[in-house]
From Swiss-Prot:
Coiled-coil residue spans: none
Signal peptide: 1-30
Keyword set, alphabetical order: Carbohydrate metabolism, Cell wall biogenesis/degradation, Cellulose degradation, Glycoprotein, Glycosidase, Hydrolase, Polysaccharide degradation, Secreted, Signal
Catalysed reactions, semicolon-separated: Endohydrolysis of (1->4)-beta-D-glucosidic linkages in cellulose, lichenin and cereal beta-D-glucans
GO molecular function: carbohydrate binding; cellulase activity
Main location: secreted
Glycosylation (residues): N520, N540, N561
Pfam families on file: CBM49, Glyco_hydro_9
Keyword Secreted: yes
Organism listed in the record: Oryza sativa subsp. japonica
A single BP term in Gene Ontology: cellulose catabolic process
Stated name of the protein: Endoglucanase 15
């Protein structure tokens, strides 16, 4: 369960790959890791998270049916779906994001999944989620977004088959809107409709009907879902708002239908809803902007932009900001641990590693086969094969190539977490011992045990290590030992990509290939939004002094509107590497904003602020969002 440890920080592309491109860019399943095995385990994990009536072909044998009366008190059938993590609550927002990312993985790398014998299992995992969403959407303007609540759930430690906690259902409707929840669910059903189009066309059409209704509902009745379903706020609060989900849903509906009204929505609302303004290096269940930007870039590179090329170009610039920041070639970069893992936060950091790895993989693949070539970053070009090599390093870190030698995928390798923070896995299976485990008995008899869990949560990707690569395998260390569905979902596509045989390409040939430059066949563009010409940032040292044998530097920063005849509004700045105090800006959700008395910068006007740094190296300052009016 996220407990506000999810995606709140500053913050794919389709097309199955041609074999020639796969040979050129591919990795070998044989560089020390069995990616096909990791893929099988990662998909299997979703069966351990199932709620509802389990089918005869259930492969995780220690689980049994649960939540069989969900929704009954509300007069609706809400049996089914997924538990989000190590608890027994069904949270709609992360569940929908999970299904969206599983679907996207299949759409990009379904052939590779089929080659590994896992495509059917992956599709079954998607359908388990979409079957539930159909139930949760009984009317066009009603969507049930949660069953159970985190507060009562956390007071008990029980198997899902035994749970006695509240199963109250919570919904959004016109009087209690939830645009982010409804739009993410619309995105999930639109993406899934493409997955099932060739095998279950009737089901695919039904998903599209629900998706269109949910998008219309989300757009018409605007509001954050956690203002309506307040019990979700402390666990999956909507910190990024609903603008990213509205754009995300529109992009997926365009992909699913080719209805250009959705593309017009995406292009026409890019500024108002943040898609063309925000440059963010974090992607997850809350912040969807990088995913939207990569999808929009795909439409542009495929020649599907039509009259909206200029708007989609701005999306693409932000997508490349994300790529450059992740691979370490941006104006500001994602931090890395000493062992090389991308690092955002202590609580469930690996969710961001897997989601970023997926976006990087699809962007690199599509850039290569479309002729786009290298991504031009502030610190140098990022070739597609360099991006993929970096992705491989992140996946290998998860699978055990890290300073601890620990695999953070349960059941993979010889050394992996044994005390996963998970109710069902940590208590003896009900099939082995059907004796009822009460709310507090679970805590007294099972939660505090020093032994490993009696049931293997095979394939689960846990939260992972901290910024120093340290990890404590303890059940009560939920920040590091709890797994979540949205950790695994993006990883499916990446593992399928890595598991591909790639024509027998050897590692030494791959290394030789990385030294060969790729010709860029298209015009280059900055990875940053159009701030290089519209907004200028200049830093200067204006004073120094010594205190207690340390030298302090006073920096003056000038931010200037360089546009021609346009006023800059809603300016947001990102700041990293700051070791002292800052004056002249106000803190905001994703960085800093100008003081309230300066709501706009007219052409040629400047904003000035200062900070003190106990080192000669300046802080990194960049523009994360703005509007030109």
């Amino acid at each position: 369960m996220a407990k506000n440890g999810g995606a709140h920080g500053a913050a794919t592309l389709f097309g199955l790959l041609a074999l020639a491109s796969m040979v050129k860019l591919g990795f070998v399943a044989g560089g020390g890791h069995d990616y096909a095995m990791a893929l099988r385990k990662s998909i299997l994990y979703f069966q351990a998270q199932r709620s509802g009536v389990l089918p005869p072909n259930q492969r995780v044998s220690w689980r049994a049916s649960s939540g069989l009366f969900d929704g009954k008190a509300n007069g609706v059938d809400l049996v089914g779906g997924y538990y989000d993590a190590g608890d027994n609550v069904k949270f709609g927002l992360p569940m929908a994001f999970t299904v969206t990312m599983m679907s996207w993985s299949i759409l990009e790398y379904g052939k590779q999944m089929a080659a590994a014998g896992e495509l059917r299992n992956a599709m079954d995992a998607v359908k388990w989620g979409t079957d539930y969403f159909i139930k949760a959407h009984p009317e066009p303007d009603v969507l049930y977004g949660e069953v159970g609540d985190g507060d009562t759930d956390h007071s008990c430690w029980q198997r899902p088959e035994d749970m006695t906690t509240s199963r109250q259902a919570f919904r959004v409707d016109p009087q209690h809107p939830g645009s982010d929840l409804a739009a993410e669910t619309a995105a999930a059903m639109a993406a899934a409709s493409i997955v099932f189009r060739g095998t279950y066309p009737g089901y695919a059409n039904l998903l599209l009907v629900h998706s269109k209704q949910l998008f219309e509902f989300a757009d018409k009745y605007r509001g954050k879902y956690d203002a309506s379903i307040t019990v979700a706020r402390n666990y999956y609060g909507s910190f990024s708002g609903y603008g990213d989900e509205l754009l995300w849903a529109a992009a997926w509906l365009f992909e699913a239908t080719e209805d250009r009204s959705y593309l017009e929505y995406l292009a026409g609302n890019g500024e108002a809803l943040g898609g063309t303004g925000w440059s963010i290096n974090q992607f997850g269940w809350d912040v969807k902007y990088p995913g939207v930007q990569v999808l929009a870039a795909k439409f542009l590179l495929q020649g599907r932009a039509g009259d909206h090329a200029a708007a989609l170009q701005r999306y693409r610039q932000n997508a490349e900001f994300f790529v450059c920041s992740c691979v370490g070639k941006g104006a500001v970069n994602v931090a890395r641990t000493p062992g090389g893992m991308m690092y955002h936060q202590r609580w469930n950091n690996l969710q961001f590693v897997t989601s970023a790895s997926f976006l990087l993989t699809v962007y690199a693949d599509f850039a290569a086969i479309s002729g786009r070539g290298a991504v031009h970053c502030p610190a140098g070009a990022a070739q597609p094969f360099d991006i993929l090599k970096f992705v491989k390093s992140q996946v290998n870190y998860i699978l055990g190539d890290n300073p601890r030698g620990t695999s953070y995928m349960v059941g993979y390798g010889a050394s992996y977490p044994r005390q996963v923070h998970h109710r069902g896995a940590s208590i003896v299976s009900i099939k082995r011992d059907p004796s009822f485990v009460s709310c507090q008995e679970g805590y007294s008899s099972w939660y505090g045990r020093e032994a490993g869990n009696p049931n293997l949560l095979d394939g689960a990707v846990v939260g992972g290590p901290d910024e120093y690569d340290d990890f404590a395998d303890e059940r009560d260390n939920y920040e590091q030992t709890e797994a979540a569905t949205y950790n695994n979902a993006p990883l499916l596509g990446v593992l399928a990509r890595l598991a591909a045989s790639c024509g027998g390409l050897k590692e030494e040939e791959y290394e030789q290939e990385t030294a060969t430059p790729v010709v860029n066949r298209t015009s280059s563009s900055s990875s940053l939004p159009a701030t290089a010409t519209a907004i200028g940032i200049e830093q200067n040292v204006t004073g120094t002094w010594a205190r207690r044998r340390r030298t302090y530097y006073r920096y003056a920063v000038t931010v200037t509107n360089r546009s021609r005849g346009k006023t800059v509004r809603e300016l947001h700045l990102g700041v990293s590497g700051l070791r002292g105090r800052l004056w002249g800006l106000e803190e905001a959700r994703y960085g800093y904003v100008p003081p309230r008395w300066l709501p706009a910068l007219r052409p040629g006007r400047s904003l000035r602020f200062v900070y003190v740094q106990p080192a000669p190296a300046p802080a990194n300052i960049w523009v994360t969002g703005y509007k030109l009016v």
